[in-house]
Design a protein with these regions (language model features):
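Catalytic cores of NTP-dependent nucleotidyl/adenyl transfer enzymes across multiple folds
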Residues: 1-73
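Long, low-complexity C-terminal extensions of enzymes
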Residues: 65-103
Length: 103
């Protein structure tokens, strides 16, 4: 079973892959791209604070940095996901800390 901490990078990778393929001209349903994007935020809400410590490979750090950059221009509509105690900006900052920090 994959927990939220380790599923988030898979969703990020799927979002980036589908976004790149769509940009390259492939017909990709935007709903599929949006689903992976929003899933990252859904899964973030499921993280347990004690789970937030791990060492991730450079490929995951790179993907997460690209995701965070792309996500700053998009809205996850957190209220529709039942997330109303934290902002998207704070979630992105926390994702950066979790997946990209050198700790």
């Amino acid at each position: 079973i994959v927990d939220a901490l380790h599923l988030i990078p898979l969703k990020v990778s799927a979002f980036l892959d589908l976004s790149r393929r769509r940009t390259a001209g492939e017909t990709i349903d935007s709903n599929k791209i949006n689903k992976h994007f929003r899933d990252v935020f859904r899964l973030y809400a499921m993280l347990i604070p004690s789970e937030k410590k791990d060492v991730f490979p450079l490929s995951i750090k790179s993907d997460m940095q690209q995701f965070i950059e792309a996500a700053t221009a998009l809205s996850a509509h957190l209220e529709d996901l039942g997330i109303n105690t934290i902002s998207q900006e704070d979630i992105l900052r926390d994702l950066n800390r979790i997946y990209c920090s050198a700790d």
